[in-house]
Amino acid sequence: MKLKQGSRLLFTGDSVTDVGRNRPVAQGTLFDPLGKGYPHIVSGLINAVYPGWGIHVINSGNSGDTSRRLAARWQTDVLDFKPDWVSVMIGINDVWRQFDSPCQPEEQVGPEEYEETLGGL
């Protein structure tokens, strides 16, 4: 990944990305609303390696999201921020819904839908 001054990095996904970020969408500032997960760690590393570059890190992860829910919010929570780079970590809830919601098939995301949804993003 080649960063440039002023680059915008956006991290999105499920709870693995969210990890307590501020709402509505967390953007790295003085009070670090990025949460305590990997977006926070990456932001710290980037700012240590590229101080003064004005690299803008955004976290739009949502705990509990499936790939279907991520696709539904893709425009507002990803594209509208006009990121230069996007990191997506999604999928555990697609698997988990098979087990925690066995009587709610409308909440379940199978492998074919998962692959198609990610391909469409």
Annotate each language-model stretch with its function.
Residues V16-D18, R23, G64-S67, D94:
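Short, flexible micro-motifs
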Residues K2-Q5, K36-H56, D65-L121:
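Alpha-helical cap/lid subdomain in secreted, periplasmic
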Residues K2-D32:
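Short glycine-rich His-centered loop
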Residues N59-G61:
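Residue-level recognition of beta-strand->loop/alpha-helix junctions
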